[in-house]
From Swiss-Prot:
Organism, as annotated: Brucella melitensis biotype 1 (strain ATCC 23456 / CCUG 17765 / NCTC 10094 / 16M)
Protein family: Belongs to the histidinol dehydrogenase family.
NCBIfam families listed in its UniProt record: hisD
InterPro entries xref list: Ald_DH/histidinol_DH, Histidinol_DH_CS, Histidinol_DH_monofunct, Hstdl_DH
Binding site for Zn(2+): 259, 262, 361, 420
CDD domains the UniProt entry points to: Histidinol_dh
Encoding gene per record: hisD
Protein name per Swiss-Prot or TrEMBL: Histidinol dehydrogenase
Any one Gene Ontology cellular component term annotated for this protein: cytosol
Amino acid sequence: MVTTLRQTDPDFEQKFAAFLSGKREVSEDVDRAVREIVDRVRREGDSALLDYSRRFDRIDLEKTGIAVTEAEIDAAFDAAPASTVEALKLARDRIEKHHARQLPKDDRYTDALGVELGSRWTAIKAVGLYVPGGTASYPSSVLMNAMPAKVAGVDRIVMVVPAPDGNLNPLVLVAARLAGVSEIYRVGGAQAIAALAYGTETIRPVAKIVGPGNAYVAAAKRIVFGTVGIDMIAGPSEVLIVADKDNNPDWIAADLLAQAEHDTAAQSILMTNDEAFAHAVEEAVERQLHTLARTETASASWRDFGAVILVKDFEDAIPLANRIAAEHLEIAVADAEAFVPRIRNAGSIFIGGYTPEVIGDYVGGCNHVLPTARSARFSSGLSVLDYMKRTSLLKLGSEQLRALGPAAIEIARAEGLDAHAQSVAIRLNL
C-alpha cells in the first residue's frame, strides 16, 4: 500500500517531517576501494584502465582500442532507426536554442570615481562527460550534458562510457556526434573519472567532469574534486505532481509511473485536495503497472517510496511543495500559472495538464539534469553557466588610486597585513 499522508491528521507535521528525511539510497562504503582505483590510474595510466576494464567490464581494450573510432560511430548511425535519429536531432536543436538564451554577457562600466569595473565570461577549455553503460545508457542524457557545453564554447568535449562485454549503445554514439562530442572512450567506472581528472597516455585530462553514475562514480567524483570541477552528485529521480480532481486520473498515473520506472529508489508523489481523485489515480497506477516492460522496477519504486499527500486546499500545497523541493514539479490545477511565482524550490516546473514531465526529459528544450534529494533548495539544474567561468576586471588610474588608496591602507593595517598596505602606499609616496 502506498504511503498516504493527510494534512487533517493531528500528527501530519511529524509524519511529513519523517517523510522528508527518509533515505532512498543505500550508501555503499566504497571510498577505500575507489581511492585505490583512482590512485592506481593516476600512477599507471592506460595499463590500469586496461586491467580494470578486463576485470569489471569483461572487455580487452588492447584489442578494441580505448578510443571509439569514427568508423564505429558511422556504423552506429547505420544501425540506428532513422526515425529515432530524427527525434534526437529535434531534441538537440531545441536544447541548443533554449540554452543559447542562457549565454551571459560581458559587462564593463566606469563608476563615479572613474574606476573601471566589469566581468568577462569564458568557456571552460575541456570537459568530460560520464555516460553510464547498461540499462541507464540514455542518448537523451548525452544531449542534455553535451549541448550546453557546445553552446558555451567548450573547445573539447570528452565522453567516457563503459562497454560491458564490448557492447555500446549505438544511440549513445549517435547522440554524441549530433551534440559535437570531440572524443569518445570506452571506459567506465571510477577508473574513467580518474582518467579524465589526471590523464593517461591516451586520454588527456579535462577541467570539469559532468554526468551521472553509480556509487563508485559518485565517490570518484568527490575524490577528484579540486583537481577538476564537478557538476553535482545526483540521487534517484523524483516527481511531485500537484493535481486537482479535474485531471484525468490515467494521465496523472502515467506521469507518476514515468518516474517510478527509472529506478527502484525513484520517488513519485501525488499531492491533491480530493481523496476520491487520489484513489482513482492509485487504481490507475495499479492498472498501468502491469503493462510496463519495467514492471518490477516501477512496482518497487511505487510500493517503497511512492506517496499520496492529501491537503485541505491548494493554498496549503505551496509551502509543502517548497519543503519537498522536488527535482520535477508538475502543477496540474485550474490556475497553474498563479502557482509558479510562489514556488521557490524545484528543479524544473511543468505547468498545466498538457505538460508532462517526460516532454522535459526529451524534447522540451530545458535541461533534464536537475538537483535531487531536496537539493533544489540551494542548487539549480545544469545550464550553459556550468561550462563557463566569470573573471572580474578592475582598472584604476593614478587619480583613482589616490581616491581609494588611503582606505585600502587603513583596512590592511587594521588586519595586520603590512605588505598589503605597502603595495598601495609605495605608489602614493606615503
